[in-house]
Amino acid sequence: MQNITIGGNLISDAKLFNDQSGKEYMSFRVAVNDIRKGEKNTTYYDVTASKTGVMDYLKKGQGVIVSGKLTIEAIDKDGKSFVNINVFARDLELYGQQRANA
């Protein structure tokens, strides 16, 4: 199992969904910014979590630190290849205030 910890900001409000058995989850996307050799790079992570109690706080721009299981899937859509980076969150921590234009 691959574990990862990321820190970044939500690019949109978290959304609730139910799996096929009816269990409730939330999902959101986190942008992690990194500067290498003077260039800004952003990596996006799709996060799923079963702890929905903090849902009301997970709004666009909110800073989060997420630790969980990492999965990577290669996707070929309309002749274009790309990679989805997914994290199933075990731990979730909020930090800072929501950034207005995140």
Residue ranges and their predicted role:
Residues 1-102:
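Single-stranded nucleic acid-binding surfaces, predominantly the OB-fold ssDNA-binding core
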